[in-house]
Amino acid sequence: MKRNTRNCREDIAKFPQRLKSALKRLIKDNSHKLFLCCLFVIIGTFAALFLANLINDAFTHRSLSERNYLNIFSLIDGAFSDEQPRKLFWIFETMAALVCFVYFFSSLKPYQAEMYQVTPKIEIPKPYGQKQHGSAWFMPDEEKARIFPAVVLFLADDKIKRLLAEGLRRAEAVDNGQYYHAKPIGIKGNIFDEAGIVLGRNATAIKEQISCITDDVHTMTIGSTGCGKTRTLVLQTLCALALAGEGIVVSDPKGELYHYMHTFLETLGYTVCVIDFNSPRKSMCYNPLQPIIDAVNRGEINEASEKAWDMVNILVEKSEKGEPIWTNGEMAIIVASILAVVYDNQDRPEYQNLTNVYEFISNMSVPAQGEKEIQYKKYLRSIPDNHPARQTLAIANVAPDKTAASFYTSALTTLRLFTNPTTYRITSKSDFDLASFGTEAKKALFYVLPDERETFYPITTILVAQQYELLVVAAKKTGNRLRYRVNFVLDEFGNFSKIETFEKKLTVSRGYGIRWNLFLQSFAQLKLVYGEEVANIAKGNCRYWIYLQSTDIETNKELSEAMGKYTTLTYSLGSSAQKYSNPSSSVNVSLIERSLLTAEEIMNGFERPYSLVISNNSPAVMESPDISKWAFNDMLGLGDKKHNQRLIELDENARPSYDGEIEIKLWKPWLELAAKTRKAVNAENEGHNSMF
């Protein structure tokens, strides 16, 4: 009884709001009729005045020529001068109003459900019933404020004003055709306590409240090429992370992010590193063999071998159709050669690189001049039993010659990229420590990649995987948590090579203070690289899916299913007409199940600035405007399209470049082996001759 009373009170309390909403909807759906009704009322009022005066004058025997029937004021005066014409006027006015009423309500469609506006391009029926067929619905604003806590940018704050002024100076320099050299401006501490992927903003004249994901969770963003993710999400996210002083690792197709961001980061006191495969002569350097070199230098030979296998697992492209022996043989050759190059050159670091690994395989897999035995077999006999390359190299040594030759050829094909002098320059030494991005404050790393080809993604994948492993080791030394949280912001992650056990890395990394923010064009990319099972686990380990736009049908279907179902109304119309009887019609109403958003609505209904966020909470529709409407735009010194192009041009031209000839330093152990062989043969021949 109490429950029914409470429900009744709630219904009564909600009645005015529901009535107001219904009236608004009624007017909106019949706006064309409303205009005609208003027009008819005006004409009808004039007609009522005219007829009331005309009839009254006729019955009172008044001369019709005494009144001007086209003068509205004369008609009003005549209609309200006496009771009789006034009654006539109200009779005619009521008739006009009745005609309007009948016209307005005669053809209303009661089978049109009340609609809810999701985005300007999506309207869906509102929910009805008691959730019999599903209870999914969109996240209300008050819940958004709780789930996505806002970090606040106070525009009058002294630190913010200094950053805005610095950005203005950069913009003015660009307008004047000058490069602006950034310097730290001495901002102590961080402006935000924490930050993350930016989803939206609420701006006033004095502040910007920025909604972002601050928890230790991973995100997966779906956005096809040209959907606007850089200008509505990525730049805002990088700026927010920078103001929080967090570690940043970014994959940057085309290099726009580096050019836009590095000056701002340096102003905040960041150390900015860049591996630039787009302009390799301007790039900093990092040797992919560095973790293996460090392990060998520590005497951790088993660890060095494991790291070599981990690296080669990423480097070697695997085929599910072929026999495993070919892939395993190729990998064994590369691993053994890496261990040989690193272990045998501990006092000659200039030779410890993948270019020398390529040359090692190329020259050791063929016989020396005038010999039949390949150099690998002679090398295997020359190294001690405890040499780390010995057991791995034996795999190829026992294979038939033709099979082993296939291993060597495949290995050389995989490593061919490192024969390029500019690639050698980038990968022959290390200018920074990958682990330092979680142990030292304010460090950012950009991987600039050509957008027209995927050649350098395997190297980038290796460095990302190695950095993760090194960060985990660093975290275990500081209470299983990095001193500074590190954020991987990996655009075009679908082009990355496969990272072994990536799904497990996602599971444990957030506890160490490592967050993965992955950007894909569709879920199909992840499935293609990792297979369906691992891809599903990886998707499950990313708490938030952020949808911008995708033309992939299966991706949109999966998102639709993930959003769930809700209960709404459906109408069916019926009519009957029998002989000798009046026709009749009926409207039947029933509750049905409906997808919160269909795949078609998702695919066609989201354009910037709107995004869809799916998680274990209710789906949220967020609004993040273009960077040009943010204070961040002024801090970065950005402007219109032409200004930004000029900024990139000036910044690129100002970067230091190594323009000299790149000398590749080669180890050449095959020459030593050939010399030893010749010496042994000569000694044997001399001994044989002395017997005679």
Predicted regions: what they are:
Residues 2-227, 231-239, 244, 281, ...:
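Basic- and hydrophobic-enriched, low-structure N-terminal and domain-boundary segments
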Residues 2-3, 48-57, 184, 193-514, ...:
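P-loop NTPase motor domains
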Residues 506-508, 512-611:
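Conserved ATP-driven motor cores of ASCE-family P-loop NTPases powering translocation/secretion/packaging/pilus
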Residues 61-65, 476, 494, 568:
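Secondary-structure boundary/capping residues
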Residues 42, 492, 546:
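Short, flexible active-site loop motifs that bind/organize anionic cofactors or intermediates
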